């Protein structure tokens, strides 16, 4: 008889709900474990089979840690602000609140049906005013610390949509949605000074138990480089062009400068002869996103401004060009081009027939740029020096002339924080008519997002909130001064920057969270989620956490001690699952046909947790067959416990049981769930080979199965005669002495040829080994009629007989 998953799973989900089995109490002295999932955006599509992979992994660990006596925090919530809900509202005229609420209900039902052990009393929702009150409060702390400021930033402005788009929303100069033209336009935006924390964000990565590849992604994103700031005087002008270079030693080879089309000097230095060309080029560049402009594969373009600069060390005149591959937002928005020793500059110089001056020997600059090491040539006082020495000397020479200095540069830019959207947290700032601005008093938080039917863009570059006079216009009660509320909203990243803190104390109305509770639970011990959040979410959350640490609000420097990225589940043909391909698998269907336990087991058994693996119906069926085998081993047709399970131990399963406990325990610690499941299968196969199974061993097995397949785990535990839930039962232990065999297999050779393999007791003496070998029938046949010259016995290994 196979088990009825629909009945059993519903029964135990109801039991857990009614008994609040997974409710977490803040037992502040107890050893703790905080297991966190990246909370989902509740889209209209509901859960897909990719979601449960990470969720199952953290759930297994949470259940395992509870059984080890840990106080476990394992919460779930909703990252519910963001563009898709607003887009839906625009397209249908429905309120994004209703849409979001409905989606959350669907997600929650699906998640509960998968048997995850979340404490639902700690659920958070980023769109709940009681939650975003504290998101706004954190913004005010950032503002007071000088880390939030207004700046004029070049943004992707789409007049047809009446809004600013992110770089990801612009493709080939048009909007991803609707294909409308997009232009680069300077607009006032809120920016967060993440660059102030660049060095800390970089240095503290070393202490984290994160995948090295992910740490490298953050290191590259921060992009710290050491070099020099160099100043070039513009010929016949007061202007100076400042560049940052990591290779000041190559300055004698700088044969032209390239400015970004938006550089502040371009208009003033361009000569009349080149004005029209420069203007036309600037217009074209404004239609491209930064990603397109810096694409290495694209053909280089640029125009000469007619102006020249003076090389501060050689005194030579060099041309000043503009080109879109130089961005105004990186470094100084200008570069010194050394075509002999840089591939991109070489390509540009060849295309526009600009001078190529070799300053490091070792290559052939007629054919290609030389980017290797070597002695300096054609470089004045730097001649004969190798790279490092030349860099130091070049900086000294520049400093002496007042034309440069040593400098550290970062690729990381400050974080553009405002969005011209409705469905986000209002930024708690008021702009007064006298030109000042203040934050909303903390006691007035939350500043509520007003309800409105008019979500369409304002058309002015402000958010739809600008259309709501009752929200926008304010008067200071004390002075009578008029003001306008900030109409931009926060990005979706804001709510997800700190949600792991709110889970610790979700109902606290007086503070973000109780300091004692924060001290108990932080840092997060295990954080599992997709690698697509490697940079933005994880970097932003680390930044906010460090600010809160400096303010004395959180007790740790870092939020997430161990981080793990689960792999992607692909469609059957190894393709990414997508609606358009029609290969998306809905977990609801699997729960119905195979059961939640089967889905959980299968997703953990597919392969290593971090690998990308194709979905397979056969694999799913195989996982179900294993659970049926477990059920049949333990449960009779009539639902009673099998008589095969006995209270006496005939020792036949001693070794495999103890091996299983050891292997599963070790594999759970390293998230090696696929190999842990293989070992559980080995144990069940051995149980089928014997007549009797020792009850404590099968109980230990059920405890190990329960974190992976909790519904069948609970049901079998109750069949074994237990009334209480398996959730807090102690994790099984193993006996080292029983892991080893008392028997070994030895080989017997005659004149170097293998003649027999024999099992003997481990402590057999050399003399006994010789006797056993010589009495073996195969060996007897091999030495018949021969004289035995010598017998060599190596304990536990072999017996070698030399016969003539």
Curated annotation (Swiss-Prot):
Motif 'KMSKS' region: where in chain: 576-580
Positions of ATP binding: 579
Localization of this protein: Cytoplasm
Residues spanned by motif 'HIGH' region: 40-51
SUPFAM superfamilies: Anticodon-binding domain of a subclass of class I aminoacyl-tRNA synthetases, Nucleotidylyl transferase, ValRS/IleRS/LeuRS editing domain
Reaction(s) this enzyme catalyzes, per UniProt: tRNA(Leu) + L-leucine + ATP = L-leucyl-tRNA(Leu) + AMP + diphosphate
Family designation: Belongs to the class-I aminoacyl-tRNA synthetase family.
Protein name: Leucine--tRNA ligase
Organism: Staphylococcus aureus (strain MRSA252)
Protein encoded by which gene: leuS
């Amino acid at each position: 008889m196979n088990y009825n998953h629909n009945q059993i799973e519903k029964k135990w989900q109801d039991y857990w709900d009614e008994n609040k089995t997974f409710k977490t109490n803040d037992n502040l002295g107890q050893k703790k474990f905080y297991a966190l999932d990246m909370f989902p955006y509740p889209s209209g599509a509901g859960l897909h089979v990719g979601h449960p992979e990470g969720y199952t992994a953290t759930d297994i660990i949470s259940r395992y840690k509870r059984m080890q006596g840990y106080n476990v925090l394992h919460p779930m919530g909703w990252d519910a602000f963001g563009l898709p809900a607003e887009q839906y509202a625009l397209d249908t005229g429905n309120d994004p609140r209703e849409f979001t609420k409905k989606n959350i209900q669907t997600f929650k039902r699906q998640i509960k049906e998968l048997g995850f052990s979340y404490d639902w009393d700690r659920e958070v929702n980023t769109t709940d005013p009681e939650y975003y009150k504290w998101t706004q409060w954190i913004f005010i702390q950032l503002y007071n610390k000088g880390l939030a400021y207004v700046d004029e930033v070049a943004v992707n402005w789409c007049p047809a949509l009446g809004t600013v788009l992110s770089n990801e929303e612009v493709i080939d100069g048009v909007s991803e949605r609707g294909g409308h033209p997009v232009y680069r336009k300077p607009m006032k935006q809120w920016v967060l000074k993440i660059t102030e924390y660049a060095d800390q964000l970089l240095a503290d990565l070393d202490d984290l138990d994160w995948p090295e590849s992910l740490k490298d992604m953050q290191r590259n994103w921060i992009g710290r480089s050491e070099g020099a700031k160099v100043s070039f005087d513009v010929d016949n002008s007061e202007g100076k062009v400042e560049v940052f270079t990591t290779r000041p030693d190559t300055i004698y080879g700088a044969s032209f400068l390239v400015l970004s089309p938006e550089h502040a000097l371009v208009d003033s230095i361009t000569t009349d002869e080149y004005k029209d060309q420069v203007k036309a080029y600037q217009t074209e560049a404004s239609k491209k996103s930064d990603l397109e402009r810096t694409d290495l594969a694209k053909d280089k373009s640029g125009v000469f401004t007619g102006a020249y600069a003076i090389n501060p060390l050689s005194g030579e005149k060099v041309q000043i060009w503009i080109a879109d591959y130089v961005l105004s937002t990186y470094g100084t928005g200008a570069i010194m081009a050394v075509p002999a020793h840089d591939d991109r500059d070489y390509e540009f110089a060849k295309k526009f027939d600009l001078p190529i001056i070799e300053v490091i020997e070792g290559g052939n600059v007629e054919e290609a740029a030389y980017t290797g090491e070597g002695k300096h040539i054609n470089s004045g006082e730097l001649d004969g020096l190798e790279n490092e020495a030349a860099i130091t000397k070049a900086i000294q020479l520049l400093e002496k002339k007042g034309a440069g200095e040593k400098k550290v540069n970062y690729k990381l830019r400050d974080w553009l924080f405002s969005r011209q959207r409705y469905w986000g947290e209002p930024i708690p700032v008021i702009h007064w008519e006298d030109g000042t601005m203040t934050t909303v008093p903390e006691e007035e938080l939350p500043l509520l997002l007003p309800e409105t039917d008019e979500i369409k863009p304002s058309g002015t570059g402000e958010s739809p909130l600008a259309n709501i006079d009752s929200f926008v216009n304010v008067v200071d009660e004390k002075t009578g001064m008029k003001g306008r509320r900030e109409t931009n909203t926060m990005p979706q990243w804001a709510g997800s920057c700190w949600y792991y803190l709110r889970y610790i104390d979700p109902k606290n109305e007086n503070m973000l969270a109780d300091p004692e509770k924060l001290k108990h639970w932080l840092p997060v011990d295990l954080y599992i989620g997709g690698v697509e959040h490697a940079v933005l979410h994880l970097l932003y959350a680390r930044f906010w956490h460090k600010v809160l640490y400096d303010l004395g609000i959180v007790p740790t420097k870092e939020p997430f001690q161990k981080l793990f990225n689960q792999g992607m589940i692909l469609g059957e043909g190894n393709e990414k699952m997508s609606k358009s391909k029609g290969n998306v698998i809905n977990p609801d269907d699997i729960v119905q046909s195979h059961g939640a336990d089967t889905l959980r087991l299968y997703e953990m058994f597919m392969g290593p947790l971090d690998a990308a693996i194709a979905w397979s119906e056969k694999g799913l069926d195989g996982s179900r067959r294993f659970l049926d085998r477990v059920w049949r081993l333990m449960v009779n047709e009539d639902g009673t416990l099998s008589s095969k399970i006995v209270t006496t131990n005939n020792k036949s399963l001693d070794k495999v049981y103890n091996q299983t406990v050891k292997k599963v325990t070790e594999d759970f610690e390293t998230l090696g769930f696929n190999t842990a499941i293989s070992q559980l299968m080995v144990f069940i196969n051995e149980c089928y080979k014997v007549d009797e199974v020792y009850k404590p061993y099968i109980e230990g097995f059920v405890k190990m199965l329960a974190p992976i397949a909790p519904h069948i785990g609970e049901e079998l535990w109750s069949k074994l005669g237990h009334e209480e839930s398996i959730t807090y039962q102690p994790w099984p232990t193993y006996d080292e002495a029983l892991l080893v065999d008392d028997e070994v297999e030895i080989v017997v050779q005659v004149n170097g040829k293998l003649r027999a393999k024999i099992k003997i007791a481990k402590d057999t003496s050399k003399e006994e080994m010789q006797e056993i070998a010589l009495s073996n029938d195969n060996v007897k046949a091999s030495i018949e009629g021969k004289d035995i010259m010598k017998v060599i016995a190596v304990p536990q290994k072999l017996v070698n007989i030399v016969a003539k």
